[in-house]
Amino acid sequence: MKRAIESLGQTADIKTDNFDTIEGSYDRIWTLSESLLPVQAQLEIKLGLKNLSVSAAEVLTDKKKFDDFCIAIGLGDMIPKSVIPTCEEDLFDGDLIVKPTVGSGTKLDGFSYTSYHSKEELLNNIPDNFFETNKKGFTDPKFNNVQSYYMVQEMLPTYSEVYGYYAYIDMDGNVHRQFCVKLDTKLIRYGNSKYYNHPYVIQSIDEDEVPDIVKESSEIFYESIADVLGVRNMFISGPDFYVYDGITKMIDCNPRIGTGNTLMDKAMGFTVIPDIISNKKIQYNKHFIWRQADLKPGTIKRVKDYSHLKEYISETSHELHEGKVIAEQTNASDSIFNMSIIVLGTKKPDMQKTYQAVKEELQNSIEYY
């Protein structure tokens, strides 16, 4: 983002803490984590900006308020059933997932974002003080100490087709849907009761591959973010649309630039973000694949030089070296072990072949104990 702004001859300041000390004249703020949106809203007031209100920040930060907003704009049929339980009787039957109302699906702690096949299995795994904690709520310093609660939500089928758009709202409130991605998910079981279902492949797709219901619903959603919430100058990643058995549901919206935008920017010669900032029309003519390498689990005895492959390896991937334990990867940004391959290009069949070739060469470079 900073590089894009400076390429246009403008200046940018990056702040990671001490936000209350920010002074000066600015025309817009971009927040790279939704947990900081409340801070941005306060800074907007302080600096005399009108891109994000306090109430809009709350809707885009809190999953329960997000669901309530979607219901209010006519998308209620797409919102999964959920509850913030304060007693056992509040829970409902079926496959369930536990989410903090303020948090990220990549921040796993053994309980948050874990799924269960039944109410009984959830009850067998909840902390002793779960219901009492949920009565008063809790805060997490990783998410700017915003008040949060545990939300128990209907778990959507693991065989769903999952789609999500990247979009942005410009300074005049015009919505620009950029491109859509398709996410392939993988179910990881923990014992007999717990499981995760996270994406292991994220790839951009052509507009004619997107279901009409996803196009129509995303348009309603983005226009409402701009018109009802009054949001301006914001990148949006999501929501994720789950399509299954003739049903479509939507979850989660991340008001940030997102990895997909970063990859598309790189694929198109680092022109996307500058063109967005300059309000230029963009023709997206490239694609990306971001996929786990799915390396064989084990402990590395030795590894051959693979530096020539690093142009295809994500920046968040872990280094391979003697003694490194390769664990089963749960998602494309797993903090325990991550080795993900990124392929940029135009023709998808060629991109898939490149992915497979890089994966095989990487795997063949490893010798295990």
Task: Indicate where each model-derived feature is located.
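Peripheral (often C-terminal) accessory segments that flank ATP-dependent C-N-forming ligase machineries
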Residues: I277-Y369
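ATP-dependent carboxylate/phosphate-activation module, predominantly the ATP-grasp catalytic core
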Residues: Y159-S224, N254-K281
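Conserved anion/nucleotide-ligand pocket segment
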Residues: D95-S115
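Conserved ATP-binding module of the ATP-grasp superfamily
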Residues: G76-P80, Y113-Y159, F221-V228, Y368
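A short, Lys/Arg-enriched amphipathic alpha-helix followed by its capping loop at the start of a domain
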Residues: R3-T11
